[in-house]
C-alpha cells in the first residue's frame, strides 16, 4: 500500500526536521520546503496528499502559496501560524485552507489533525441517511455523494474535501439546523475539549455559498439558523 505523502512548508529548519521525523515514524512519506516558491515547485512534482503550510515565510508567504494551490488543486491544507490576530487566521481560511494550528503547538496535536483531515477527505461517504446510489438532485444542484462531485446548472463546481464534507452533513438532514459545535465535531473531528474558533465553520459556509448560491449574500440553500448555526433548506429534491 502506497504511503500518503505530506508536504511540510516552513522556513524554520527545526520545525521541518521535527515534523519530518515524527510524521515519517507514524507512516507518512514526508517532503519539505523552506519557502513558498520552492514549495510550489515541489508540489507540482510530488503531488502530495496533504500540505502543512506556515503562513510567514520568505519569497512567497503562506497566503500566496494557498492562493496558488487553490487555482489547481483541492489538496487539504493545514496552516501553521504564530500570528495572534484572529483576522490573519481567518484570511488563510478564506483563501482555501482547511484547518489551522497556532504555534507553538504539540506535534501530537498536528498528527491528530492530519489523520482527521485525511480520514474525512479520503473516505467514501458512510452516512446512512444518504442514498446508496449517491446521486441527489436539489434544485439546480446535482450532488454525487460517492464521487464527491457537485454540479451547478450542469457545470462542475470544485469543492475541497472539507467543503464537500460540510455540504454532505448539511444535506443529510435538510431542514434541520446544525450548531457550530456539532459541525466542528462531525466535519473536523474536534472534541469539546479542544478550544477552536468557531469562525472556521463560518468561513467554510461562506466558501460554500460563494460556490453554490446564485446570490451568496442572500442565500436560498445554505441558511443561517439564528442563534443556532446553519441548515440546508429543504427543497423539491430527488434521489437517483
From Swiss-Prot:
The modification 4-aspartylphosphate is found at residue 54. Residues 5-118 form the Response regulatory domain. GO terms for molecular function: phosphorelay response regulator activity; transcription cis-regulatory region binding. The keyword Metal-binding does not apply. GO terms for cellular component: chloroplast; cytosol; protein-DNA complex. The keyword DNA-binding applies. Keywords: Chloroplast, DNA-binding, Phosphoprotein, Plastid, Transcription, Transcription regulation, Two-component regulatory system. GO terms for biological process: regulation of DNA-templated transcription. InterPro entries: CheY-like_superfamily (IPR011006), OmpR/PhoB-type_DNA-bd (IPR001867), Sig_transdc_resp-reg_receiver (IPR001789), WalR-like (IPR039420), WH-like_DNA-bd_sf (IPR036388). Gene3D superfamilies: 3.40.50.2300, 6.10.250.690, Winged helix-like DNA-binding domain superfamily/Winged helix DNA-binding domain (1.10.10.10). Pfam families: Response_reg (PF00072), Trans_reg_C (PF00486). It is found in: Plastid, Chloroplast. Residues 74-92, 133-234 bind DNA. NCBIfam families: ResRegRpaBCyano. Probable promoter-specific protein mediating the interaction between DNA and RNA polymerase. This is Probable transcriptional regulator ycf27. It comes from Porphyridium aerugineum. The gene is ycf27.
Amino acid at each position: 500500500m502506497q504511503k500518503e505523502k505530506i508536504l511540510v512548508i516552513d522556513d524554520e529548519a527545526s520545525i521541518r526536521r521535527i515534523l519530518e521525523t515524527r510524521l515519517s515514524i507514524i507512516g507518512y512519506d514526508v517532503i519539505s520546503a523552506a519557502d513558498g516558491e520552492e514549495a510550489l515547485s515541489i508540489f507540482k512534482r510530488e503531488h502530495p496528499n496533504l500540505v502543512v503550510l506556515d503562513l510567514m515565510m520568505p519569497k512567497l508567504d503562506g497566503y500566496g502559496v494557498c492562493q496558488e494551490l487553490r487555482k489547481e488543486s483541492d489538496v487539504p491544507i493545514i496552516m501553521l501560524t504564530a500570528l495572534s490576530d484572529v483576522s490573519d487566521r481567518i484570511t488563510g481560511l478564506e483563501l482555501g485552507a482547511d484547518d489551522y494550528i497556532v504555534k507553538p503547538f504539540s506535534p501530537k496535536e498536528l498528527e491528530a489533525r492530519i489523520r482527521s483531515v485525511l480520514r474525512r477527505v479520503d473516505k467514501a461517504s458512510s452516512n446512512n441517511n444518504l442514498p446508496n446510489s449517491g446521486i441527489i438532485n436539489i434544485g439546480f444542484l446535482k450532488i454525487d455523494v460517492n464521487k464527491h462531485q457537485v454540479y451547478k446548472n450542469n457545470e462542475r463546481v470544485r469543492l475541497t474535501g472539507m467543503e464537500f464534507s460540510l455540504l454532505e452533513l448539511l444535506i443529510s438532514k435538510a431542514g434541520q439546523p446544525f450548531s457550530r459545535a456539532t459541525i466542528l465535531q462531525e466535519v473536523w473531528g474536534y472534541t469539546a475539549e479542544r478550544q477552536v474558533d468557531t469562525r472556521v465553520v463560518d468561513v467554510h459556509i461562506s466558501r460554500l455559498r460563494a460556490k453554490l448560491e446564485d446570490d451568496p449574500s442572500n442565500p436560498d440553500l445554505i441558511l443561517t439558523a439564528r442563534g443556532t448555526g446553519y441548515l440546508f433548506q429543504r427543497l423539491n429534491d430527488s434521489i437517483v
